[in-house]
Amino acid sequence: MGNTDFHVTVKKKEVVAAVLPMHHEHWLPMSNLDLLLPPLDFGVFFCYKRSKINNDTKDDDETIKKALAETLVSFYALAGEVVFNSLGEPELLCNNRGVDFFHAYADIELNNLDLYHPDVSVHEKLIPIKKHGVLSVQVTGLKCGGIVVGCTFDHRVADAYSANMFLVAWAAIARKDNNINTVIPSFRRSLLNPRRPPQFDDSFIDSTYVFLSSPPKQPNDVLTSRVYYINSQEINLLQSQATRNGSKRSKLECFSAFLWKTIAEGGIDDSKRCKLGIVVDGRQRLRHDSSTTMKNYFGNVLSVPYTEASVGQLKQTPLGKVADLVHTCLDNVANEHHFPSLIDWVELHRPRQAIVKVYCKDECNDEAAIVVSSGLRFPLSQVNFGWGCPDFGSYIFPWGGQTGYVMPMPSPNKNGDWIVYMHLQKKHLDLVETRAPHIFHPLTACYLDLTATY
């Protein structure tokens, strides 16, 4: 494994505001879908292999910083602050407060970085802690001349789709790529307005979301993050094994079914429940007059349907039937009615804070609760700031609570392999490694070409 015993020195901290300041600050309301998110931050980082020769990290920092100031003109929400209104609901103060920007140095070479254990090698070392604002950025120069760009986003303001839009636009501006039509984000909250009158009649939503009377309890068992490499052949084989009666399931459905079943097989008490949630982006299901309207929408457009079964049931059920359960779960939101109903449901219950039910694991009756979020459209190759595509990149989301979080992403090798970020109880991470070592390979430098050229 790589090295986690290294030091990061912050050389300078700045606040980067939009290069064209706003004439008047204003308040941007959160949509009803934003209001379903508790105060959570998520991180993302990108590793770039560089040579020490002809490499000036200071110039690279300035390039990124200048491009950030330009990008924030369009993505102005990221330069604001989350405040609370008289009802206690969050809203976005667009005041061009700016983004905390850290210049740092780490005394380690990229190929020695322990990517398998991001909790101790990446989180809060190469990805900054966000103390103020909506977004924080850190650019870290490495001993080998490489660079790591890390970002932390306030999830109440942006989902991963929104973050990806920003990252691609930021990189295009940095490399002065005039051949790419930079996306102009849409902050039209009216696109997600509730209907008048609200038309909520979906009992599925009542069973999927719960109200919070107090903040979620701190977990008894601290969850751990690990990153794995999965070969495309194993992914295809899982899909083949889960196909029955000609009903082909998606790779994500088959992977989720396999993970759900594997974790259940480690349970001792067959009566305990095992829950699986799948994050669904609603942009394709909220059609408006313009085909690009929701495509460019910046904010949260997510729902997390979940399904559950007993440990004993999952042990006895063939993988194909487990994949059918996952597919049926997703069918509940794969229609044009779910998201408008969810928006109306939130409106009917405001200002009560609701949260997806699967996030609140029942410690007495649940063996495990896991949420899988697809990062397979992670635009890794497009986050090129001018010195080449990233040699590695991943989202990092240690989101608290006792519900696990899993995100598969494309390998930088562009060969169909996956990088999978997993944030689970240690016993469950050990379990998948023990029961499926042919699938879950701890990520090491040997899977990635991270050695600098001189």
From Swiss-Prot:
UniProt record, GO biological process: circadian rhythm; green leaf volatile biosynthetic process; phenylpropanoid biosynthetic process; response to ethylene
Top EC group: transferase
Description of the deletion phenotype: Suppression of isoeugenol biosynthesis and reduction of several floral volatiles including phenylacetaldehyde, phenylethyl alcohol, phenyl-ethyl acetate, phenylethyl benzoate and benzyl acetate, but increased accumulation of homovanillic acid and coniferyl aldehyde.
Catalytic activity: (E)-coniferol + acetyl-CoA = (E)-coniferyl acetate + CoA; (E)-cinnamyl alcohol + acetyl-CoA = (E)-cinnamyl acetate + CoA; (2E)-geraniol + acetyl-CoA = (2E)-geranyl acetate + CoA; octan-1-ol + acetyl-CoA = octyl acetate + CoA
Record-annotated active site: H155 (proton acceptor), N384 (proton acceptor)
One example GO MF annotation: acetyl-coenzyme A:acetyl alcohol acetyltransferase activity
Pathways involved: Aromatic compound metabolism; phenylpropanoid biosynthesis
Pfam families: Transferase
Assembly information from the UniProt record: Monomer.
Family membership noted in the UniProt record: Belongs to the plant acyltransferase family.
Physiological role: Acyltransferase involved in the biosynthesis of the floral volatile isoeugenol, and which promotes the formation of phenylacetaldehyde, phenylethyl alcohol, phenyl-ethyl acetate, phenylethyl benzoate and benzyl acetate. Catalyzes the acetylation of coniferyl alcohol to produce coniferyl acetate. Also active toward 1-octanol, cinnamyl alcohol, geraniol and sinapyl alcohol.
Protein name: Coniferyl alcohol acyltransferase
